[in-house]
A protein has these predicted regions:
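Non-catalytic nucleic-acid substrate-recognition regions in nucleic-acid-modifying enzymes
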Residues: 2-133
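Active-site neighborhood for divalent-cation/phosphate handling
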Residues: 132-135, 141
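C-terminal edge-of-domain segments
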Residues: 139-150
Length: 151
């Protein structure tokens, strides 16, 4: 089972949960701006097919608890990025941050980018490029208090 997050417009979380509840194995958990659920690839496809109010269906890559920027760097640097990103690909990071520990979202995004490119550079000798226009990989980072989730 994988963890997913289906984004939707604020205020439509319940509607979105009702739309997908009969197509997924697990009960959806309503959150601000989306729905969390666990499922398999079949659940993912059915959610994409039947959700009318859902916008982005995100698959969780990594999650951890953290209360300082150095630990974010260490956690992301220790992750194996090779299944989704290598030096030949471009990527972008989109960060949403609501935390008393991390005040500057741009700085957090920069440290996340540094950890990822440093790891790939160490493994391959080259780093992937960041591209704002049509990147190969889009990473969504959601930080709430001390919880960091990477999709």
């Amino acid at each position: 089972m994988e963890d997913f997050f289906l984004t939707c417009p604020r205020g439509l979380e319940e509607v979105t949960a009702n739309q997908i509840s009969k197509y997924i194995s697990d009960d959806p958990i309503i959150d601000k701006g989306g729905i969390s659920f666990a499922g398999d690839i079949n659940d993912m496809y059915l959610t994409n097919l039947h959700s009318r109010t859902g916008m982005h269906l995100l698959k969780k890559i990594l999650s951890f608890h953290c209360d300082d920027i150095d630990n974010i760097y260490k956690n992301l640097y220790s992750h194996d990025w090779s299944p989704i990103l290598d030096s030949s690909k471009t990527f972008i990071i989109k960060t949403k941050c609501k935390s008393n520990f991390f005040k500057n979202t741009n700085f957090v995004t920069l440290k996340i980018k540094d950890a990822i490119v440093d790891k790939i550079r160490k493994q391959e000798g080259k780093r992937p490029s960041v591209s704002k226009i049509n990147p190969d990989v889009i990473l969504f980072i959601i930080i709430r208090d001390d919880e960091v989730k990477i999709y």
